[in-house]
């Protein structure tokens, strides 16, 4: 079956990407097979493998000639049948990943874009000694766990447990970054329409691999949270807002840390020509001259970026021996509704750690999973996840743009439903 799947991949790939040479096609095929072997949701891959198996037989050419394969994939994506749309979306997403990434380094597609190419680097995992007990276990070292560990560390003995590793202080390529600093190699997707779910993994969590965008939660959203949770002015209270003030001050969140790079000058001009106002996005950096964040999502080290690791887990603020990297929390032991132990996997060995208190801040994907695996039962667990999908838009310009250069998101605007862009730059 694997040989037939590979045969179908080569036929479809050559039709969708006719300019790729043989070596580039082979690299893409290797990564495609890597996805098939490592995709978290096996049920999502089964349908695709069956279709590819059937597609490999010669009878297919009677109905779908090679030259018509691109149109066939487009028709799948726009089909009225949800199963076919799902198949078309899945094929497009996985083929796209196969061109953007490579097991040998940078994806083949970037050779055509004058894109900076970086070789695979290495991660040196630290040996950690898992304790028998800890007063407070904070699970997750990102924006939630980082704040919690920082505050609680003033009063309690805090152990920080993180699924990922420390950063390597290198500028990494895309494949290496996704494989080492994101959960499930950065290939996990939603069912149905294949929205890629990128969950940061490593000391600092998402704060170590994001673009440093630091937007405060708007008042209207805080009011919505109060309404949804039945709270009486909790999220919109002065106390809650002072907590945000504290975090923003500690991380040095400021619009002065952002500058409009060449790639967004045209966007700013277009907004101005259409009488649309825009604002500069504040960033959490300690140096206004830190203006390169194109590779920060792949673990690029920059001491100016104020991740939770830099701000709150430095040796002068947090006991380094209480930071347990590369530890996977399997579940919690419960007694009378209270967590008494956490079950921690490290280097293939399962450890049971006694705890007085647990702060579970493993992200919106893993937090409910750990609760479910621990025996918690609630109709909302594992449901009601809301995403804000991001879509890329490409433009052709007379001048070279280098979209990976400079800070990434620089400005934002509120475009209402009745407003349209009328004038061209």
Explain the meaning of each model-derived region.
Residues 93-125, 233-331:
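Conserved redox-cofactor binding core of oxidoreductases
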Residues 2-101:
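Flexible, low-complexity segments enriched for small/polar residues
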Residues 177-256:
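Redox-cofactor-proximal catalytic regions of oxidoreductases
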Residues 135-159:
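N-terminal Rossmann-like FAD-binding beta1-loop-alpha1 element of flavoenzymes
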Residues 338-342:
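Short, hydrophobic/aromatic-rich segments at coil-to-beta transitions
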Residues 414-425:
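Single conserved hydrophobic/aromatic residue that forms the stacking wall/gate
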Residues 164-169, 174, 202, 345-350, ...:
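Glycine-rich loop(s) and the adjacent beta-strand/alpha-helix scaffold that form part
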Residues 130-133:
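Short helix-loop-beta connector
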């Amino acid at each position: 079956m694997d040989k037939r799947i590979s045969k179908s991949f080569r036929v479809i790939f050559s039709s969708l990407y006719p300019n790729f040479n043989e070596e580039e096609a082979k690299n893409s095929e290797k990564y495609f097979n890597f996805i098939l072997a490592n995709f978290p949701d096996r049920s999502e891959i089964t349908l695709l493998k069956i279709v590819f198996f059937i597609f490999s037989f010669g009878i297919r050419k009677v109905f779908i000639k090679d030259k018509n394969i691109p149109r066939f994939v487009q028709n799948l994506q726009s089909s009225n049948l949800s199963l076919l749309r799902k198949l078309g979306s899945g094929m497009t997403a996985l083929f796209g990943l196969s061109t953007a990434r490579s097991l040998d380094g940078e994806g083949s597609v970037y050779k055509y874009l004058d894109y900076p190419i970086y070789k695979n680097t290495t991660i040196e995992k630290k040996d950690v000694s898992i304790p028998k007990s800890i007063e407070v276990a904070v699970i997750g070292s990102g924006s939630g766990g980082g704040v919690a560990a920082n505050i609680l560390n003033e009063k309690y003995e805090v152990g920080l447990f993180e699924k990922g590793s420390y950063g390597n202080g290198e500028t990494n390529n895309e494949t290496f970054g996704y494989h080492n600093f994101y959960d499930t190699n950065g290939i996990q997707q939603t069912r149905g329409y294949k929205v890629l779910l990128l969950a940061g993994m490593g000391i600092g969590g998402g704060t170590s691999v994001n673009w440093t965008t630091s937007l405060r939660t708007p008042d209207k959203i805080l009011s919505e949270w109060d309404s949804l949770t039945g709270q009486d002015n909790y999220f919109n209270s002065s106390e809650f807002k002072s907590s945000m003030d504290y975090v923003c001050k500690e991380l040095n969140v400021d619009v002065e840390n952002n500058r409009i790079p060449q790639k967004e000058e045209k966007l700013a001009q277009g907004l101005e020509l259409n009488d649309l106002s825009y604002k500069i996005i504040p960033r959490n950096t300690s140096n206004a001259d830190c203006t390169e964040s194109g590779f920060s999502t792949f673990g690029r080290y920059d001491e100016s970026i104020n991740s939770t690791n830099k701000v709150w887990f430095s040796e002068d603020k947090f006991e380094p021996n209480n930071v347990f990297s590369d530890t996977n929390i399997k579940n919690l032991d419960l007694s009378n509704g209270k967590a008494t132990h956490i079950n921690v996997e490290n280097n293939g060995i399962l450890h049971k750690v006694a705890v007085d208190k647990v702060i579970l801040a493993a992200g919106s994907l893993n937090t409910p999973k750990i609760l479910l695996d621990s025996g918690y039962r609630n109709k909302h667990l594992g449901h009601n996840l809301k995403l804000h999908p991001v879509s890329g838009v490409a433009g052709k310009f007379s001048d070279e743009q280098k979209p990976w250069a400079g800070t990434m998101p620089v400005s934002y605007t509120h475009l209402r439903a009745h407003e349209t862009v009328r004038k061209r730059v």
